[in-house]
């Protein structure tokens, strides 16, 4: 059996459908969907991953031994050497307070003292998708060979390499090959699997270099900024090697705007028309001196034309110019063009990925702007005409004329520019998908068409001795504009006038104006500026901008830095300017490119980045107090959610020192003890204007943003009438019935925590309780689950009614493993059992458990095993 590993389930399905001699059979291994089919007389199976199946992380501590030196230990006993600088203090330490341990340093908790050690801590790879890994190994044991068919780029090659390492754990001698493709067309997939190549380990190493460097820099800088001014309130202050200089670009532009000193100028403008023309045929006229910088001169000129009703045409000039067709889309140019149409870069990439997975467009993460000679452009145009009737007339013209594609400045051999494949059914696409697909399809056609011809007519007018001008452009020959109208200005048709003709003039006015500061970046322009400065990659720039919005460093579009974003950059620029400069990030990205080319090694590049970070951190730690003071006001403002209804002081987001949970508390504490719970699993932000204060109780109202769900607004006061939900009987308790007593199961919302649950009226005796979704109107059905006997309820949400069994341990839910907290039907017994198991587990951990509490830790990749030592070896 041949095992084919794709990056996602949709990709696995597409590959199976394209290669299969018949219809692929959908199957399951454990809980993972797979596709079985026959190809060239051989049994094949495709499995789709969920992106990265391994995630980089740190062990819980770094330890020191006089003979072994510094090291970390994973749960399975593997010892990873840590190349700590000699200047870092070694145990024994004068204090036993965390992060200091008897034999090392704890790096699990967020402590400033641990950051120099975290900078040099070994990186381990933990299973991010246990079920997928389990299924992958199961298939590998039954396979004769494996084909890696993940996306062909750094991330895809790393995903494939990680998957292969898991395969090697159970099938070390399995032959492996690589399929490289740029779209899910049958021809492309068939060609890729007929021409298999080897896995590019250099490319995978470059991807892992970026992964490790981003983890190390992000963890150290984020912890530092958060700890520098925490005080138990506010959000985590995110930072990173790319996002920080990107934020600095926006703040730098904002500083330019704030420092801008406007200058006064004056303009004289009005309207003109051929004599007797209708009002709709009027055209704009302006004084030949576009801007008067002298007010007296402007008023003198205006005095000559004020009230004048006619002008004489002094000259008529016509000129034609060619507008060249655009170059093919690469990722950045697509994001910029889509942003101009109202689609953010991050959303553009999500939509483009869905179009790619559906087989409608080619691979969307590319730098290439030159179509390869192997791409049959005519065939793509012909296919495009068949599936898209609206573009058929343009496609026909493209096929009839000379087809000479434009060329951009960047030519690579990995993937072609982004183009429509000519397959699929565009009519099934929704609004955003259709809008982006049309942009891509029309851009592709435009790159194959000729230039547009634009004719400009310029009129020079004499208005009572003062020179005026009027100008208008008309599209004479559409050329590529017939396919690609984006950004095209409306025709400004000038009347057919000749020298000496008289025209009427109207509404001539003198306008006082001021020069404008530099414009803020749009998201599209910011992506282009990041590319220009060497910040991020084609695959990461959009997500970096999205991240800056998520942590509230940026707001609005055009992009504007928040008070906190400005404070962070100002402080870092003062105490560690290298972090905010794009030069260091560009240098590290260049190092990764050398790894990709085989000119450098992953180990050397990551070590170099650690050294750079260590120097930056050393400077920051010297100025922690000053930096904390510099961002203090902004941190407080960022944490604020409203005014306390009791004392009027600020209510802010706080974090409990004991539970690490979030809540809203008053800045007047301890004199004022007002606190409110915060819904779990959401990002909280304040509302503005009238919506910010609850009309019922006067407490603040907040916006809650769940992960990848629709945001909702609530009053922070759980006892507020707007949050009240009446108790609802949903059934009778099965456990109580078996014990010979009656108990009702009641759906209830806690006034203290805001959480919803179902609990028996005899809970103290039976311990029966079930969790409920945080949102959605509940309806009792009176029915019970045939499998477990728990109540069946209906939850009405914006996405529709959901009929569910409330028991999270119900056998019917085994097909989809429950995530998050499990519910025990016999709570008191279950809690004791769980506690006993945890206690036993703690007692049986290895001697070095303080350094390795991550139960899922796995050995790092085979290719590096020669550099690692085990405890047994020592």
What are these regions (language model features)?
Residues 2-3, 35, 166, 222, ...:
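Basic, low-complexity terminal or inter-domain segments flanking catalytic cores
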Residues 39-47, 51-125, 234-353, 357, ...:
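Long, highly charged, low-complexity internal segments
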Residues 1-217, 506:
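Intrinsically disordered, low-complexity regulatory segments
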Residues 361-367:
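Short amphipathic alpha-helical interface patches used for protein-protein assembly/oligomerization
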Residues 142, 184-270, 319:
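C-terminal or mid-to-C-terminal helical accessory/interaction module adjacent to the motor/catalytic core
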Residues 124, 150-152, 170-177, 197-204, ...:
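Short, polar/flexible loop-turn hinges at active-site or ligand-entry regions and domain interfaces
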Residues 150-152, 336-338, 365:
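Short glycine-centered, acidic/aromatic-flanked micro-motifs in structured strand/loop junctions
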Residues 9-16, 43, 98, 102-104, ...:
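Amphipathic alpha-helical transducer elements in NTP-driven molecular machines
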